[in-house]
Amino acid sequence: TLPAAPGASAGSPDGRLSTTRVSPDAEVITQVMARLSGARRPIIIVGYGAREAMDEVVALAESLNAPVLTTFKAKGQIADDHPLAAGVLGRSGTPVASWFMNECDLILAFGASFSNHTGIEPSKPIIQVDFDRMALAKFHRVEIPVWGEIGTTAHRLAELSKSISPGNEQKTELAERWAIWREEKHSRLADDHGKGINSASVFAALGNAIPGDAIIAVDVGNNTYSFGRYFESQGQRILMSGYLGSIGFAFPAAMGAWAATQDQPENSGRKVVSISGDGGF
């Protein structure tokens, strides 16, 4: 450490950092609105990069009546009981999200990775919004790459989308698809294949046991795939290391989350849950 004069105050970022509220070019916004206006079945996909801008993204989804799918790492950023939530997409995901991916005619992605694990279909027309320019079209070409801060961009699009008159068909279909999936999950509760408690039972019980403000640390492996597929988020804060190769993450992460929050008056007593397989634990 460097010595400081008695009574010296800490420095600030003033004069060193500019605003992060980067707005896309007006011409790009015009292109995006033209595609949104012509789409009959748009969907929104959010990744972990959109975690601080979900209020703006959900407001945009509501103005478009567009289903919101999440990547696995973004699970919980929109509660599964929201009328426009479609759950997780990809190998760890729900058949609800998969169905809407197949049926959509336009993808609007915010802060999402396009790795193979996410399940985003590259042949679909894609508008990709990201604050990180290096993330745009990183894996393949997209129809409209949009460089901008996610909250600022989503808010701007939501304001302009007020002139669009979306139908309610997709919202109705969401309710129908969730009903089908929940019925299927219920049927799996009693089907253990002779191997004891199954994943559907574990995560149905967990969903009933923990409050909506809990923190959930998730490990890797089959237990994690099952968590993404079966657990219905109520808005819990979900922590995960990524995808594979980091077995053993959940339990120490849960301890760290507990230690980091319990001294804060607003978080005192907040439940913390660790989800691990036998190898991870």
Language-model regions, residue ranges each:
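Glycine-rich phosphate/diphosphate-binding loops that line cofactor/substrate pockets in enzymes
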Residues: 28-42, 60, 101-103, 205-214, ...
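A short, small-residue-rich loop immediately preceding and capping a beta-strand
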Residues: 45-46, 99-110, 263-281
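Conformationally flexible catalytic loops at phosphate/diphosphate-handling active centers
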Residues: 1-36
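Glycine-rich phosphate/diphosphate-binding loops and the adjacent beta-loop-alpha structural elements
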Residues: 40-53
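Gly-rich Lys/Arg/Thr-decorated short loops/hinges at beta-loop-alpha junctions or inter-strand turns
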Residues: 6-17, 79-81, 179-190, 235-236
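Active-site diphosphate/adenylate-binding microenvironment
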Residues: 178-269
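Glycine-rich, acidic loop regions that bind phosphate or pyrophosphate groups
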Residues: 74-177
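General beta-strand structural signal in soluble alpha/beta enzymes
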Residues: 45-46, 69-71, 109-110, 148, ...
